[in-house]
Amino acid sequence: MLRLSSICLILSFITLLAEEGPHWAFIKPNRHKLPTVKQTDWPINPIDYFILSKLENANLKPSPAADRITLLRRVHLDLIGLPPTPGEVKSFLNDKSPDAYKKIVNNLLASPHYGERWGRHWLDAARYADSDGYSHDAPRVMWQYRDWVIGAINSDMPFTQFVIEQLAGDMLPSATTAQRIATGFHRNTQINTEGGVDKEQFRVDSIFDRIATTGEVMFGLTFGCIQCHDHKFDPFPHVEYYQMFAFFNQSDEPRVEAPTQEENKRRDEHNEKVVDLNARVKASKAKAPERKKLETELAKLKKTRPRATTALVMQQRKSPRVTKRFIQGDFTRPSEVVQAGTPSVLHVFPKNKDPNRLDFARWVASPNNPLLARVTVNRMWQRYFGKGIVETENDFGTQGTLPSHPKLLDWLATEFAKVGWSPKSMHRLIVTSATYTQSSNARADAKEVDPLNILLARQERLRLDAEIIRDAALASSGLLSQKMGGPGVYPPQPPGCMNLGQHRKTWKASSGEDRYRRAIYTYRWRATPHPALKVFDTPDAFSCSTKRLRSNTPLQALTLLNDPAFMEISKGLARRVIENKSSDKERVIYGFQLCLSRDPDKREVFILEDFLRRQQSSFETAPNETKTLLGAQDPLPNIKASQHAAWIMLARVLLNTDEAITRE
């Protein structure tokens, strides 16, 4: 029994909440006026007024702009995930026009590499992988969805359309193959192929995963707990969870043909042969044995029709299922029947006799949705500054953190809608702001007032994501393949890694340019992800991931030094600097430019030249070690084997520097 005083306290708390009204995140964002600032010469675009206003209130000033080389490297890594080439750095430094930086930004947004960089962020949230998960972790064909994401981002598909096609592209009028492939977003759930699996339990668990992912990605909310009971903190009743469940409960999960251009070409050629042979059979006046031979040949040809790549998609059922609420989330304890619906605390769901998944998708993408734009621009902001305006980027509920700049968040959300939900427009706006272009150097005055840099008196220094560390190294070495799309590839990895799961898998390293593709194309096993990516905190794809963690361990340095792929990259970098420059000093400077985008200072040149001499001397007395390090490489003309080996060691040093794996 509660004491009377406790009951009164609870009732007072409930009354207080009622008086406060709806939680801020559940109210449609307003477009606030730009605040007045004192330092009027600093803002470049509206973002800066909101940031500067908060800084001035705290008696802080923004940091100076980053130097041009730092800024160029930063925006390259942020927008396309690759460092600028020495030629691009030189061209930018020589361009004195006032719009030089804006031209760089526009070129990067137009690059196909932009979709690869920002597609990786989305694939994390979509829990994309090339295997089923669970202990069997069988392979699956999902790369068509990955390529769809990259293509949609490169084409600057309006974000609302991007959302609708992934939630219900199969239900759009005259849905294309691409729109059906888009529904792979919710086929990224794990598939349990173990013996003794209860198929209905697995099907229900998949829907639970889809609701949880939709909640986190589209709403920045945690719906998992209302699977079993009313939300303890947010106004989401248990029954409303199963109203959303009803939308996904009407879907089948087929595998459909999604032929590539090359496969369509082979099929067309095959069909032409069938038509030609069929005509010959009909026109034949040959005797029975010869005619029979032609007919047999035709039958064989029809059976050998080239196969097409398949894709996992969503498809609406012809016969609807009845949806019931599960007591405490237990599918074996169904309760009352529920109809499809949406959380009542959010924007109104249009009245429809038989609402379906497409209606739900359009409701999610509605301009009246108070969360979609806020959550999306907040995640964009997070990628550029290390944390979002709302730091709990996947919890906009009452237990999440309050926005550090609430008026800026709302302004960005309304701006996103105003520019037609164009992600490229928002990226352009953010990276051309004075806020983004600040130096990341720490300042004592700002650290004292704002130790976590919440007010953004400077930029943030961030370690690169796992995939970008590999991609940047490949680009520096000159080995990076520009090939896009297609099935996953298998870059080298240490032996024995595939023995770690319950069932051994094979990993035959790719050859040719597939060996040096961007990491987004690396085959992604859930149970045994590529170790060089995992050690740098790539998510495991078992569930939705909207923010990368950043650890700092000795294993990371050892990976950059000794991983088979990075050894090949080091050899490629060494060969590149040797072949392109003649003196040691020129080669040191060139290697620095390739890896760090800048020239070394005199002290750095001295240290590296001294290291090079000591390494060469060591290899001259150890011919077997030299031979082992060089491996099967073609010898370089006019250079000793010991000197070549020393350059490989220096390349390993450059790729292992903190600066090489950091975005300033």
Stretch-by-stretch model annotation:
Residues 171-272, 533, 545:
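Sequence context surrounding c-type heme c attachment/ligation sites in exported
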Residues 523-526, 534-544:
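A structural supersecondary motif
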